[in-house]
A protein has these predicted regions:
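Short amphipathic alpha-helical segments embedded in low-complexity Lys/Glu-rich regions
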Residues: 86-96, 139-150, 210-218, 236-245, ...
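Basic, alpha-helical interaction scaffolds
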Residues: 174-216
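P-loop NTPase catalytic cores that bind/hydrolyze ATP
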Residues: 214-228
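Acidic, Ser/Thr-rich intrinsically disordered and amphipathic helical segments
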Residues: 45-49, 69-73, 116-120, 150, ...
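Conserved beta-strand elements of beta-rich interaction domains across eukaryotes
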Residues: 93-94, 110-113, 148, 156-158, ...
């Protein structure tokens, strides 16, 4: 694997000789081993094994039916009682959830400071928890007073997170669905997300924003970055996982953010100055025009409170939201 320190040493000697040192982005893009360097028969066998793993953890007809029933149940409960609409977002409608994956819902209603929407939803679910005739078993209802306020519970032993007036989650869902269709290859983007999520959740234990770990959308953005740069050399989920691990295990997270088009020096913030990757724009998967259209279609106008804090705030892990560049998708990660 390439080592960032080797490139830094090269840069220092190059400057001494009068040459321009490569940017981090260019160094990273050039230093990765090419998957085809592995014997083709070995690579095909490994991809078949990876496909077996994806088949074991991907959504099934039974899991789809179960989750659809739970979503419909919550929609009916809240809709009949409060007249509020409830929509699923995240991994369930994207069909990239793991067997242990939760259901993300958002309920729409009054956003006024004196609104009782959140407490009303909590009361409805607490009533169902005591209702022996309820359609599904409801347990462990709790209110989470976090940056995004939630009512969390177990319904039929599936974790359900209900947020409120979260249009951003629906916009992100639409954007990722559009990207998957753009990539094609029998939903290679979604299959790769499933494999990489499985590795992050079951093997490395780094997935889970509520536990100070990386969020699902942040992970999906990192996967999308790998597709954007290396899509021409990737035809299976294992090749994507290989590129993902190779690239980000050597990334200089202490000094750089990651954006869809390359690293951004933390020292340059609040200005978003993307380093040159030495990859021609024509060779990238997503053109600037594609992203601009997506932002126009799926981004929301900033609220007054968001306008007052509209600068990207560096944390321990820094990932720039493709749809809103002042939003740090790595902000959930705490230092271990």
């Amino acid at each position: 694997m390439g080592d960032f320190r080797e490139w830094a040493a090269y840069g220092s000697s190059a400057v001494a000789r009068g040459y321009r040192a490569p940017t981090l982005a260019a160094a990273m893009a050039q230093s990765l081993s090419h998957p085809v360097a592995i014997r083709r028969d070995s690579l095909r066998a490994a991809e078949r094994r990876a496909a077996d793993i994806v088949a074991r953890v991907r959504p099934t007809d039974d899991s789809e039916s179960k989750r659809k029933s739970v979503v419909a149940y919550v929609q009916k409960l809240i809709g009949v009682s409060l007249g509020s609409e409830v929509f699923p977002f995240g991994s369930v409608p994207l069909k990239t959830y793991l067997p242990d994956g939760d259901i993300d819902l958002t309920a729409f209603g009054s956003a006024a400071p004196d609104s009782t929407l959140i407490s009303d939803v909590r009361c409805i679910l607490e009533y169902e928890e005591q209702n022996s005739d309820a359609e599904f078993e409801v347990k462990d209802v709790q209110y989470i007073n976090a940056e995004v306020r939630l009512v969390k519970c177990l319904i039929d032993n599936i974790i359900v997170d209900i947020s409120f007036n979260q249009m951003g989650g629906l916009c992100t869902l639409c954007f990722l669905e559009l990207v998957d269709r753009h990539i094609g290859k029998d939903h290679l983007f979604k299959r790769s997300i499933i494999l990489i999520k499985a590795w992050c959740y079951y093997e490395s234990r780094i997935l889970g924003a509520h536990h100070g770990l990386i969020s699902t959308y942040a992970l999906e953005t990192l996967v999308l970055y790998i597709f954007n740069l290396f899509h021409k050399t990737m035809d299976g989920p294992l090749a994507v996982l290989y590129r993902f691990l190779e690239y980000f295990s050597n990334f200089d997270w202490d000094n750089y953010c990651i954006s869809l088009y390359g690293p951004v020096a933390i020292a340059s913030l609040p200005d978003i100055v993307i380093e040159d990757t030495d990859i021609r724009s024509a060779d990238l998967l997503l053109s600037q025009e594609f992203v601009k259209r997506s932002i126009k279609k799926f981004s929301l106008p900033l609220t007054e409170s968001e306008k007052s804090s509209a600068k990207f705030c560096p944390k321990y892990l820094n990932i720039i939201d493709p749809l809103r560049e002042n939003n740090n998708l790595g902000r959930s990660v705490s230092k271990g």
